[in-house]
């Protein structure tokens, strides 16, 4: 079971190419700071604007650099079932510990279509699958009943990344799927409540910028020390908010640039975060104690 603070990695660019050195260094820093796991090529990794070869390159660099020290859950989603299967096969051949599969975006399939999508991917996989429910990006929500059906019929499906922000979901999903279902939130701001509802961890954007604090927060939750977790949440909450003032990962990349970790380059149609919001991110990083 995946647990704790699992970083949804940004993809560093330099001159519109993958910055391999910056990606390697980011992975090393994440592991040194205590992150429990890594997710390359998800939403935060700008996967929609990566070519197939770039997608594979990012996954391979992350796995090679991590070298088994922490699990790597490779983003392998697509609105094309066939393409998602190809990404899954690449990830398992590259040595990924699991794959993250987003609900099909743009196509707007029915609940039956969602079920068949995951069933086909499951049949092609030999490693754990985490279902990624993010209706704000995909325009469809995976119903709890559909999720339970997928879990029951697809032996490689082990859990969910829930990015709905709805704190009813973890309890409903646990009741529908059972205690062995891996509950991961994708919303940093509500992670404390999610963990109190029985969650196991967070696939986190903020952990790109504050990996040690996010790891400590998750460890406190896993230990049942919610008083300590609340203190850390109060340090992190302004940063959770500020990083999403404009479309993710613009805020996270700006923050990493301010920390000297990489360039802040984004790929169109995403653009650099507005100057007024940059100031808010700076203030939030100072509040968290990660920027002087």
Swiss-Prot record:
It is an enzyme of class 4 (lyase). Pathway: Amino-acid biosynthesis; L-lysine biosynthesis via DAP pathway; (S)-tetrahydrodipicolinate from L-aspartate: step 3/4. Keywords: Allosteric enzyme, Amino-acid biosynthesis, Cytoplasm, Diaminopimelate biosynthesis, Lyase, Lysine biosynthesis, Plasmid, Schiff base. It comes from the Bacteria. Pfam families: DHDPS. Pyruvate binds at residues 44, 203. Its EC number is 4.3.3.7. It catalyses: L-aspartate 4-semialdehyde + pyruvate = (2S,4S)-4-hydroxy-2,3,4,5-tetrahydrodipicolinate + H2O + H(+). The active site is at 132 (proton donor/acceptor), 161 (schiff-base intermediate with substrate). Homotetramer. Belongs to the DapA family. This is 4-hydroxy-tetrahydrodipicolinate synthase. It comes from Rhizobium meliloti. The gene is dapA.
């Amino acid at each position: 079971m995946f647990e704790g603070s699992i970083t949804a990695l940004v993809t560093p660019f330099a001159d519109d190419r993958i910055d391999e050195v910056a990606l390697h260094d980011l992975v090393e820093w994440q592991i040194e700071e205590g992150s429990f796991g890594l997710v390359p090529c998800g939403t935060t990794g700008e996967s929609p604007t990566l070519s197939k070869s770039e997608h594979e390159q990012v996954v391979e660099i992350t796995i090679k650099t991590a070298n088994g020290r922490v699990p790597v859950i490779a983003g392998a989603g697509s609105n094309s079932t066939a393409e998602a299967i190809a990404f899954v096969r690449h990830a398992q051949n590259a040595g990924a510990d699991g794959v993250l599969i987003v609900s099909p975006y743009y196509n707007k399939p029915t609940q039956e279509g969602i079920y068949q999508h995951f069933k086909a991917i499951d049949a092609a996989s030999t490693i754990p699958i985490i279902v990624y429910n993010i209706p704000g990006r995909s325009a469809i929500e995976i119903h709890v009943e559909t999720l339970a059906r997928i879990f029951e019929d697809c032996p490689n499906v082990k859990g969910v990344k829930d990015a709905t922000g709805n704190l009813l979901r973890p309890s409903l999903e646990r009741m529908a799927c059972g205690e062995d279902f891996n509950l991961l939130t994708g919303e940093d701001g509500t992670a404390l409540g999610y963990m109190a509802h029985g969650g196991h961890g967070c696939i986190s954007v903020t952990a790109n910028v504050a990996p040690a604090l996010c790891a400590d927060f998750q460890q406190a939750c896993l230990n049942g020390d919610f008083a300590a977790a609340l203190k850390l949440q109060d340090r992190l909450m302004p940063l959770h908010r500020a990083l999403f003032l404009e479309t993710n990962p613009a805020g996270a990349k700006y923050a990493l640039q301010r920390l000297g970790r990489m360039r802040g380059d984004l790929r169109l149609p995403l653009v650099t975060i507005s100057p007024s919001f940059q100031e808010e991110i700076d203030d939030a990083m100072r509040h968290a104690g990660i920027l002087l």
